[in-house]
């Protein structure tokens, strides 16, 4: 759980923004959303496999674009 120490004279809004950023970096909200409903192990594997394929295709696309720029 992210912790934020409020500095003297620091506005509440700034401290809240730092806390939200810390939560986002820690992945707390995405974890909560993911656990809202039970996901079967097969569905989880399928989702992770699809995400891996998507990452791989995105990486290939970036590499091809980088090669194009060289010429």
UniProtKB/Swiss-Prot annotation:
One of its GO terms (molecular function) is structural constituent of ribosome. InterPro entries: Ribosomal_bS21, Ribosomal_bS21_CS, Ribosomal_bS21_sf. The keyword Ribonucleoprotein applies. GO terms for biological process: translation. GO terms for cellular component: ribonucleoprotein complex; ribosome. Keywords: Ribonucleoprotein, Ribosomal protein. PROSITE patterns: RIBOSOMAL_S21 (PS01181). Belongs to the bacterial ribosomal protein bS21 family. HAMAP family: Ribosomal_bS21. This is Small ribosomal subunit protein bS21. It comes from Alcanivorax borkumensis (strain ATCC 700651 / DSM 11573 / NCIMB 13689 / SK2).
């Amino acid at each position: 759980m992210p912790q934020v120490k409020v500095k003297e004279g620091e506005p509440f809004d700034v401290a809240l923004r730092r806390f939200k950023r810390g939560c986002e970096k820690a992945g707390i909200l995405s974890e909560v959303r993911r656990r809202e409903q039970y996901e079967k192990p097969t569905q989880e594997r399928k989702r992770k496999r699809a995400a891996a394929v998507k990452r791989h295709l995105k990486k290939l696309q970036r590499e091809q674009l980088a090669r194009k720029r060289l010429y």
